[in-house]
């Protein structure tokens, strides 16, 4: 068997209203990249992007170029970070356009980044900007939405099972119950099972 390389894909390289409100107009992940400073001798910072420059993910040609570049280096798919907060999606434009247009024609899966968004970048929960709220009702809404993505022919499957990553399984109130519900729903939709991975 051949090992397949899947690159994590952070869809934050374009502005959204929430980030404009929380961090200032025009904020994107490039804001943080460009202001990086060296912390020790020979620490090369900031790293200025090479091949694609300070790209904007709203542009379809950027996404096509990324897929082409990934293929050149042996990457076989993208794992898009997926942000779901009790039915509210953030940073969804890029993935929505990938689904609607069918481009790039490049395999993908999703990683649910189920952490609170906070005022700090250290993973702490001191000042929550938008928080996770878990419930069985939301689990059902979420898997219903996810199944639409699973049905895309580009979606990465392992032995027919859609591959879904979860960032913080320990934050789920009852991970086993959520997994059981999700597996039941994907089976109702014609898949043999769901291939869940913890990040």
Predicted segments, located by residue:
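Glycan-processing catalytic domains of CAZymes
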Residues: 1-199
């Amino acid at each position: 068997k051949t090992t397949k390389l899947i690159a994590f894909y952070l869809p934050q390289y374009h502005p959204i209203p929430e980030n404009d409100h929380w961090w200032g107009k025009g904020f994107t992940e490039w804001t943080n990249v460009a202001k990086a400073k060296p912390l020790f001798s020979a620490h090369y910072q900031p790293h200025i992007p090479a091949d694609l420059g300070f790209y904007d993910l709203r542009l379809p040609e950027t996404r096509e170029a990324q897929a082409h570049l990934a293929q050149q280096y042996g990457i076989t798919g993208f794992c898009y970070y997926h942000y779901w907060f009790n039915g509210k999606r953030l940073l969804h434009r890029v993935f929505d356009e990938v689904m609607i247009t069918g481009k790039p024609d490049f395999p993908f899966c999703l990683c649910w980044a189920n952490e609170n968004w906070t005022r700090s970048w250290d993973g702490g929960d001191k000042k929550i900007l938008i928080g996770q709220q878990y419930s069985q009702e939301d689990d059902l809404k979420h898997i219903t939405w996810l199944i639409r993505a699973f049905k895309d022919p580009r979606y990465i499957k392992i032995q027919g099972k859609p591959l879904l990553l979860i960032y913080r399984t320990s934050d789920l109130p009852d991970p086993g119950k959520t997994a059981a519900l999700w597996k039941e729903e994907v089976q109702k939709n014609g898949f043999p099972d769901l291939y869940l991975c913890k990040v």
